[in-house]
């Protein structure tokens, strides 16, 4: 696999809608920063540069899956940039949480819409295993990129095509997490903190990574949440397979290499 040479350096992000106070806070709280095709990765002071570089390699491969040094889907990348998508990294859970809290304090002090800001931000703990890098970075790409580029298809709301596929996978439409999923379901996430849009985000991740082979040896670990863990089993999810394989959307066809 081609090696990517990436450098970590301070970037003063252009955030005209939020102002210089927020920009300065981001630079102070998350001083280790890099961009991948214009998409921002920011890390706390103690986040190891090697881990930020690893995240950058993964993001680059999710966006440029065919390795031709340009994004596969410019619409998706444009939405990531337009919506100020940010991957925020901390070395440990405590490091990331404290840094988030500090940033939220700044947002509230300068009267920024916290909910709107958080919708475009995904957190990643650098000490987590590789599978977490695949998951959280893909969440950023799908939640901020694909969902905004193709809302009628990948929008994280009832009525989009991916939501219809998910409702089949869950055994029906459930606005809130049910106590028990139907027996015919193969996607049954019981985290009550995960609302309907969150369920769509997770469903996209499980579907794509199962199709690409990331979950083959993890059935015992993940079956309580996800049963279709192999490319062969994914054939059962016909509607989602149509979306994942449609040439128009340029969905990644191979897993990123670490």
Regions found by a protein language model. Give the residues of each.
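Hydrophobic h-region of N-terminal signal peptides that target proteins for export
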Residues: 10-19
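Sec-dependent signal peptide recognition
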Residues: 2-10
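Catalytic-loop region of hydrolases
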Residues: 22-23
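Acidic/His-rich structured neighborhood in mature extracellular/periplasmic domains
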Residues: 27-29, 36-182
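Post-HExxH zinc-binding segment in Zn-dependent metallohydrolases
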Residues: 146-220, 236
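Conserved aromatic-histidine-acidic binding/catalytic patches
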Residues: 43-47, 125-129, 189-201, 224-232
């Amino acid at each position: 696999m081609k090696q990517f040479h990436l450098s970590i350096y301070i970037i003063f992000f252009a955030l005209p809608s939020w102002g210089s106070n927020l920009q300065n806070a981001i630079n102070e709280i998350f001083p280790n920063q890099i961009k991948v095709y214009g998409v921002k990765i920011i890390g706390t002071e103690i986040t190891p540069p090697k881990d930020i570089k690893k995240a950058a390699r993964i993001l680059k491969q999710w966006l440029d899956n065919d390795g031709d040094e340009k994004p596969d889907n410019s619409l998706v990348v444009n939405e990531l940039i337009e919506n100020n998508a940010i991957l925020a990294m901390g070395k440990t859970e405590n490091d990331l949480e404290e840094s988030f809290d500090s940033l939220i304090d700044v947002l509230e002090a300068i009267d920024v819409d916290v909910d709107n800001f958080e919708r475009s931000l995904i957190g990643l703990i650098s000490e987590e295993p590789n599978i977490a890098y695949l998951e959280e970075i893909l969440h950023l790409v799908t939640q901020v990129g694909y969902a905004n580029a193709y809302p009628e298809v990948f929008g994280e709301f009832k009525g989009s095509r991916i939501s219809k596929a998910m409702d089949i996978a869950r055994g029906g439409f459930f606005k809130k997490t049910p106590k028990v999923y139907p027996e015919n379901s193969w996607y049954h996430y019981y985290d009550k903190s995960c609302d309907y849009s969150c369920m769509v985000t997770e469903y996209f991740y499980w579907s794509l990574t199962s199709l690409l082979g990331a979950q083959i040896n993890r059935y015992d670990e993940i079956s309580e949440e996800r049963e279709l863990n192999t490319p062969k089993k994914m054939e059962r999810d016909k509607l989602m397979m149509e979306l994942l394989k449609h040439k128009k959307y340029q969905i990644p066809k191979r897993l990123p290499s670490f």
